[in-house]
Amino acid sequence: MTLKTIEGTFIAPKGRYALVVGRFNSFVVESLVSGAVDALVRHGVSESDITIIRAPGAFEIPLVAQKVAQQGAYDAIIALGAVIRGGTPHFEYVAGECTKGLAQVSMEFGVPVAFGVLTVDSIEQAIERSGTKAGNKGAEAALSALEMVSLLAQLEAK
């Protein structure tokens, strides 16, 4: 018996991508944005099909993503931001609510929401994950969005 496998590809179908970006910790976040845009363009997405929407911080990203998803104008949303642990419980609240909110948007609207929000213990970890030795999590989120758009298109065609 041959098992059938359905999986997404990184070939960019015609589609529009919204990058919802938290401005807080911008010294890290801008590297994530550059990585995401570069990955999308390298995989065939036209720059005219990429929109960057800036929110104040990670906590606000889910609401902005929800409004974007409601519009129905984008095939995927790529959430980018950075939450760096400090000396108070603030980190847990912001990171947790951002994560839950983005998952809820994806499930409620059926739009892929790729998670590129860094939740790290230190500035050093944030820098490592935004383009140095740990790669660029913005680029990884963009690839995840491409793959999900492709996968969902295949599932909807069945």
From Swiss-Prot:
Transmembrane as UniProt keyword: no
Would you say which domain of life the source belongs to? Bacteria
Q: Where does 5-amino-6-(D-ribitylamino)uracil bind?
A: 24, 58-60, 82-84, 115
Alphabetical list of Pfam families matching this protein: DMRL_synthase
Q: GO CC annotation: what is one?
A: riboflavin synthase complex
| Pathway per the UniProt entry | Cofactor biosynthesis; riboflavin biosynthesis; riboflavin from 2-hydroxy-3-oxobutyl phosphate and 5-amino-6-(D-ribitylamino)uracil: step 1/2
Query: What are the binding positions for (2S)-2-hydroxy-3-oxobutyl phosphate in this chain?
Result: 87-88, 129
Q: What is its EC number?
A: 2.5.1.78
- Catalytic reaction equation(s): (2S)-2-hydroxy-3-oxobutyl phosphate + 5-amino-6-(D-ribitylamino)uracil = 6,7-dimethyl-8-(1-D-ribityl)lumazine + phosphate + 2 H2O + H(+)
* Annotated catalytic residues: 90 (proton donor)
Under which main EC class is this enzyme filed?
transferase
Q: Which InterPro entries match?
A: LS, LS/RS, LS/RS_sf
- Keyword terms: Riboflavin biosynthesis, Transferase
Q: Which GO BP annotation is one of this protein's?
A: riboflavin biosynthetic process
MF annotations from Gene Ontology: 6,7-dimethyl-8-ribityllumazine synthase activity
Task: Give a short account of what the protein does.
Answer: Catalyzes the formation of 6,7-dimethyl-8-ribityllumazine by condensation of 5-amino-6-(D-ribitylamino)uracil with 3,4-dihydroxy-2-butanone 4-phosphate. This is the penultimate step in the biosynthesis of riboflavin.
Quaternary structure (record): Forms an icosahedral capsid composed of 60 subunits, arranged as a dodecamer of pentamers.
Q: Fetch the NCBIfam families from UniProt.
A: lumazine-synth (TIGR00114), PRK00061.1-4 (NF000812)
What family does this belong to? Answer: Belongs to the DMRL synthase family.
Instruction: Name the chain's protein.
Output: 6,7-dimethyl-8-ribityllumazine synthase
Organism, as annotated:
Pseudomonas putida (strain ATCC 47054 / DSM 6125 / CFBP 8728 / NCIMB 11950 / KT2440)
Quick one: which gene encodes this?
A: ribH
